[in-house]
């Protein structure tokens, strides 16, 4: 009897999606603050709707930041250069409501900048997860990798003129047929590909479908995963001219599954963008990913999840958990011991070990097309730490 397979789906959205626009603005603000002041405390939220972008939150920094310029530059770089594409970066209203970090939080977390790195407490309570799987070279779920890469490719063909009819907003979704091999995930084929892209008035639905197949799907999805039974839904609504903030309101932190593992593993609920590294929602999730990825890359397991938890003002995590889904070469308790020996989960030390206080255009890169599985030197949490285990006991 043939082994039983199952279907699993992951989605992604483009940099022109209104929620993702907000993530990018929030991280552009963070980058600008950190570039001038590495100890900036940033909690920056962004909201957008027709003809308006607003940034709000709590920021304590020595940096001089032109928030309006950051908003307009970010929107322009995405491609929002006129009302008909969903937003005009140079004419839209920009509202700013930024205050300083609460002194109550400041004294509890970093002692008003007096605590040494190893003493810095978590910026809040919370739970964070890291996940990794051996099904792709990135050690990420294939369904998520393909959905994300389709979105990135859609933006590429828009910006380089290959498909000049494409507008900034767009969504992708990929269903993969999997085999469960004793807890490890083995992709068999791509079952369904869905792309909905904003487009201009000039293009027909037939042209859209042909261009998407030729210039987006073919370069991204390996031929071995496609067959005559693969289903394609290409702009199934039939019309997607109105998009961006004109089509939908946008808000920072509403695409947290797209940012992480596409529905695989687990998520603690905390968003990443617009948060400096004392916010463990971000730094904790980054170090948990590094731990999970290192477990897989070191051959300790084929798939695993790592959970950590924190209390506000307390440096050490309250708990660390590892589950290898039965794929571990050694017992999970042994893997957990290795993780605790090799990773420092104190927020101040995460910032140092992953170099998370460096700004520039560092974090804006994370704000579209996923925070994990990326091949970029700035994604320091993707660097594998070799975990040595006693082969004799394995």
UniProtKB/Swiss-Prot annotation:
Keywords from the named record: ATP-binding, Cobalt, Cytoplasm, Magnesium, Metal-binding, Nucleotide-binding, One-carbon metabolism, Potassium, Transferase
Binding positions (L-methionine): 58, 101, 248, 279
Entry binding sites for K(+): 45
Pathway: Amino-acid biosynthesis; S-adenosyl-L-methionine biosynthesis; S-adenosyl-L-methionine from L-methionine: step 1/1
Enzyme Commission number(s): 2.5.1.6
UniProt keyword annotation of Nucleotide-binding present: yes
UniProt-annotated binding residues for Mg(2+): 11
GO-annotated cellular components: cytoplasm
Annotated binding of ATP, by residue: 17, 169-171, 237-240, 248, 254-255, 271, 275, 279
Subcellular location: Cytoplasm
Reactions catalysed: L-methionine + ATP + H2O = S-adenosyl-L-methionine + phosphate + diphosphate
Cofactor note: Binds 2 divalent ions per subunit. The metal ions interact primarily with the substrate. Can utilize magnesium, manganese or cobalt (in vitro).
GO molecular function, one term: metal ion binding
Pfam family, one: S-AdoMet_synt_M
GO biological process, one term: one-carbon metabolic process
Subunit field text: Homotetramer.
Function of the molecule: Catalyzes the formation of S-adenosylmethionine from methionine and ATP. The reaction comprises two steps that are both catalyzed by the same enzyme: formation of S-adenosylmethionine (AdoMet) and triphosphate, and subsequent hydrolysis of the triphosphate.
Name recorded for this polypeptide: S-adenosylmethionine synthase 3
Organism, scientific name: Hordeum vulgare
